[in-house]
């Protein structure tokens, strides 16, 4: 089975930002699997969150990115699975904390709430940050 660096999906509200992000990631030589949606026609965000979740669980990729209107619904839908730690990140600091303290495996972005000027910095920080373990591991065990 082919694996990817990142699996990504959006609803219709996040489609344009998703397209920009995919291009950015590919320029960084990262392999990206796009689960849709593939246009701005209205769709149901839980369907696309589930696609990324399933691909993470099936180990198609270790990291996922979801983009919705605000990202709230996407993060709720993704976090229904016990194997997923989806984090809605709005800036570099939240992206760093999501990985360092919570070992997040899905970055969630709100197309209408994230600053498009810093979205690449958010993604870079999320991808570069390693889980610190230690006391954070103990805390994660309490929510599994």
Swiss-Prot record:
Pfam families noted in UniProt: LacAB_rpiB
GO molecular function, one term: intramolecular oxidoreductase activity, interconverting aldoses and ketoses
Binding site for substrate: 12, 135
EC class (word): isomerase
Catalytic residue positions: 101 (proton donor)
Annotated keywords: Isomerase
Gene3D superfamilies in the cross-refs: Sugar-phosphate isomerase, RpiB/LacA/LacB (3.40.1400.10)
Endpoints of the signal sequence: none
Example GO BP: carbohydrate metabolic process
UniProt keyword annotation of Isomerase present: yes
EC numbers for this chain: 5.3.1.-
Record family assignment: Belongs to the LacAB/RpiB family.
Protein name according to UniProt: Putative sugar phosphate isomerase RBE_0278
Biological classification of the source: Bacteria, Pseudomonadati, Pseudomonadota, Alphaproteobacteria, Rickettsiales
């Amino acid at each position: 089975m082919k694996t990817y660096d990142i699996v990504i999906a959006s609803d219709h509200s996040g489609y344009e930002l998703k397209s920009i992000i995919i291009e950015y990631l590919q320029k960084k030589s990262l392999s990206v699997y796009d689960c849709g949606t593939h246009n701005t026609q209205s769709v149901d965000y839980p369907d696309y969150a589930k696609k990324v979740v399933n691909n993470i669980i099936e180990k198609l990729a270790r990291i996922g990115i979801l983009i919705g209107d605000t990202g709230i619904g996407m993060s709720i839908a993704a976090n229904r699975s016990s194997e997923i730690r989806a984090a809605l990140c709005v800036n570099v600091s939240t992206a760093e904390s999501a990985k360092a303290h919570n070992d997040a495996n899905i970055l969630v972005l709100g197309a209408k709430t994230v600053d498009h000027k810093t979205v690449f910095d958010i993604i870079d920080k999320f991808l570069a940050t390693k889980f610190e373990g230690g006391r954070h591991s103990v805390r994660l065990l309490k929510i599994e």
